[in-house]
Regions:
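Signature of N-terminal electron-transfer/Fe-S-associated modules in redox systems
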Residues: 1-158
């Protein structure tokens, strides 16, 4: 195995995994960043979503050999440096999580989407979030939280 350097949450981590290892398992097993969850292992449910250079990415389908030296990976643990991100705050205010398992992936998808569209309508939210599965069915609360967090973002809260 070759040692690889990966920029995760603003810090360079040296990992000892083979290049064909999915990023998800490097995050969880080697780096102990367990906020990113394993759901389906096929990139279909969204529980494993992280940001790769600011874009939502399924970490279960992204092998570490695909990462370039200047790539930046952000996990739920690195989403906000000081306080909670506005999306995280809205998730709490709207009481979105039930079991909470899918929520880190939901939040990471929402944050990336709201960077592209900070004033979405319901249809745009549903379209952006449709690849994230919540078995508890909290989709209505997710929509409310996204409207609330988009307002926070538009008002300058970071």
């Amino acid at each position: 195995m070759e040692k690889l350097k990966i920029n995760i949450n603003g810090k360079v981590a040296v990992v000892n995994s083979s290049g064909d290892t999915p990023l998800l398992w490097v995050l969880r097993d080697e780096l102990k960043l367990t906020g990113t969850k394993f759901g389906c292992g096929r990139g279909l449910c969204g529980a494993c979503t992280v940001h790769l250079n600011g874009v939502e990415t399924r970490s279960c389908q992204t092998t570490i050999e695909l990462l370039e030296p200047d790539d930046e990976v952000t996990t739920i643990e690195g989403l906000s440096k000081d306080n909670l991100h506005p999306v995280q705050e809205a998730w709490i205010e709207q009481d979105v999580p039930q079991c909470g398992y899918c929520q880190s992936g939901q939040i990471m998808t929402a944050v990336a989407f709201l960077k592209r569209n900070n004033n979405p309508n319901d249809e745009e939210i549903d379209s952006a979030m449709k690849m994230n599965i919540c078995r508890c069915g909290t989709y209505q609360r997710i929509r409310k939280a996204m409207h609330s967090s988009s307002e926070k973002i538009r008002n300058g809260q970071k």
